[in-house]
Swiss-Prot record:
Keywords: Cytoplasm, Ribonucleoprotein, RNA-binding, Signal recognition particle. HAMAP family: SRP19. Involved in targeting and insertion of nascent membrane proteins into the cytoplasmic membrane. Binds directly to 7S RNA and mediates binding of the 54 kDa subunit of the SRP. It comes from Methanococcoides burtonii (strain DSM 6242 / NBRC 107633 / OCM 468 / ACE-M). GO terms for molecular function: 7S RNA binding. Belongs to the SRP19 family. Its main location: cytoplasm. GO terms for biological process: SRP-dependent cotranslational protein targeting to membrane, signal sequence recognition. One of its GO terms (cellular component) is signal recognition particle. This is Signal recognition particle 19 kDa protein. The keyword RNA-binding applies. SUPFAM superfamilies: SRP19. The gene is srp19. Part of the signal recognition particle protein translocation system, which is composed of SRP and FtsY. Archaeal SRP consists of a 7S RNA molecule of 300 nucleotides and two protein subunits: SRP54 and SRP19.
């Protein structure tokens, strides 16, 4: 069970190839192609969100894939946090 005061961010939340119904929570323009758990973790650390990695977790809509998730501090809306993480990953990727 997750802690109170934490947001759950899945790689699927930032994945450009997914639909909104499939789990993406930010616009396609802001989203990423195939985000990795380690990228999410590094970006969250850079943003001082105190990420906790849960690599063995499976996204409910794709329960057959083990994508993992991160728990970050709940300082603002989940979509805002997701946009900041995606922007940081894009900068790290060089784009």
């Amino acid at each position: 069970m997750r802690e109170k005061g934490k947001l759950v961010i899945w790689p699927a939340n930032l994945d450009k190839s997914r639909s909104r119904k499939g789990g993406r929570i930010i616009s396609r323009k802001s989203s990423l192609e195939a985000p990795l758990l380690r990228e999410l973790t590094a970006a969250a650390e850079k943003l001082n969100l105190n990420p906790e990695v849960e690599a063995d977790k499976k996204y409910p809509r794709t329960w057959w894939e083990s994508s993992g998730r991160i728990l970050v501090d709940n300082n603002e809306a989940k979509t805002m946090v997701a946009r900041k993480i995606a922007k940081t990953i894009k900068e790290a990727r060089g784009g």
